[in-house]
UniProtKB/Swiss-Prot annotation:
A motif (Gly-cisPro motif, important for rejection of L-amino acids) lies at residues 137-138. InterPro entries: Daa-tRNA_deacyls_DTD, DTD-like_sf. Homodimer. One of its GO terms (molecular function) is Gly-tRNA(Ala) deacylase activity. It comes from the Bacteria. PANTHER family: D-AMINOACYL-TRNA DEACYLASE 1, D-TYROSYL-TRNA TYR DEACYLASE. Its EC number is 3.1.1.96. The gene is dtd. An aminoacyl-tRNA editing enzyme that deacylates mischarged D-aminoacyl-tRNAs. Also deacylates mischarged glycyl-tRNA(Ala), protecting cells against glycine mischarging by AlaRS. Acts via tRNA-based rather than protein-based catalysis; rejects L-amino acids rather than detecting D-amino acids in the active site. By recycling D-aminoacyl-tRNA to D-amino acids and free tRNA molecules, this enzyme counteracts the toxicity associated with the formation of D-aminoacyl-tRNA entities in vivo and helps enforce protein L-homochirality. This is D-aminoacyl-tRNA deacylase. The lineage of its organism: Bacteria, Pseudomonadati, Pseudomonadota, Gammaproteobacteria, Moraxellales.
Length: 147
């Protein structure tokens, strides 16, 4: 499972012109679910994201996690993160979990994230989403947990 996390000043997701999720300061999390991923894999990754210290503390160093920074989380499914890109000129999405299975796992991970953190917003699984953000820094990290 892979997550591309971005520290943002604000972010929102729109589907068909309607806002489905919106946060002010916090983390925009793009989540890619692999063929062999499980709920346990996802929980491990979510736990890491929640504890990952990429917000400035009182000394101006990356010492605070999203909770300590009083931020929110915008969680967006993105199967393209699982693409194999080493060969050729077209991404291979074979490593991504099939959509029907991925949707169920994504929904479980949203529920888990909400059980661990109060301010969680989401996109809509498999929808054509428009993501608006103001990246803070920019600060962007690619996190991965093996199944």
């Amino acid at each position: 499972m892979r997550a591309l996390i971005q520290r943002v000043l604000e972010a929102k997701v729109e589907v068909d012109g309607q806002t489905t999720g919106e946060i002010k300061k916090g983390l925009l999390v793009f989540l890619g679910i692999g063929r062999d991923d499980t709920l346990a894999t996802g929980q491990k990754l979510i736990d890491k994201i929640l504890k990952y210290r990429i917000f400035d503390d009182e000394q101006g160093k990356m010492g605070w996690n999203v909770s300590q920074a009083n931020g929110g989380i915008l969680l967006v499914s993105q199967f393209t993160l699982m693409a194999q890109t080493q060969k050729g000129l077209r991404p291979d999405f074979g490593p991504a979990m099939p959509p029907s299975d991925a949707k169920a796992l994504y929904e479980q991970l949203v529920e888990y994230t909400r059980s661990q953190f109060e301010n969680v917003q989401t996109g809509i699984f498999a929808a054509d989403m428009k993501v608006h953000l103001i990246n803070d820094g920019p600060v962007t990290f690619n996190l991965e947990v093996e199944a």
